[in-house]
């Protein structure tokens, strides 16, 4: 049995939509943003926080290393490739993503 690689990198994207469009965007984001990541990343999470007037979405993808992430995201992995309808949904188009090195993990990936 081949052991699955352990992620060392988390790539975090954030975007906000008007609260009344959050359910529609959640479905769109899953279909067009999360599903492609499922095929390439070691794991991916879609998170949502509903507030009074807006909803924030956070997508976290987990990667074995920067090279693996760059094969998916391109030469500059901080650069965002906006989805076709992001401009329609998002209050403001994010300018970049956050890339963090995983220094400890328990449960999902850790021992």
Q: Which sequence ranges carry the predicted segments?
A:
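Basic/polar N-terminal segments that are highly enriched at the extreme N-terminus
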Residues: 1-6, 110-111
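An amphipathic, aromatic/His-enriched active-site/gating alpha helix that lines ligand/cofactor pockets
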Residues: 4, 31-43, 62-99
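A generic structural micro-feature
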Residues: 5-7, 51-53, 91
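Short acidic/polar alpha-helix capping motifs at helix-coil junctions
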Residues: 8-11, 22
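Short, well-ordered beta-strand segments in beta-rich or mixed alpha/beta enzyme
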Residues: 10-16, 45-77
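Short, surface-exposed ligand-recognition loops at beta-strand->loop->(often short) alpha-helix junctions
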Residues: 16-27
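Residue-level signal for secondary-structure boundary sites
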Residues: 21-23, 67-69, 105
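Acidic/histidine-enriched, glycine/proline-rich intrinsically disordered or flexible terminal extensions
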Residues: 100-111
């Amino acid at each position: 049995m081949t052991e699955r690689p352990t992620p060392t990198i988390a790539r975090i994207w954030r975007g906000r939509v008007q609260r009344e469009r959050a359910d529609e965007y959640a479905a769109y984001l899953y279909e067009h943003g999360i599903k492609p990541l499922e095929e390439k990343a070691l794991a991916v999470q879609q998170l949502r926080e509903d507030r009074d007037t807006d909803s924030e979405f956070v997508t976290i993808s987990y990667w074995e290393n920067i090279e693996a992430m760059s094969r998916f995201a391109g030469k500059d992995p901080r650069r965002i490739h906006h989805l076709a309808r992001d401009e329609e949904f998002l209050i403001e188009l994010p300018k970049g993503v956050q890339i963090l090195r995983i220094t400890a993990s328990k449960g999902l990936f850790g021992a």
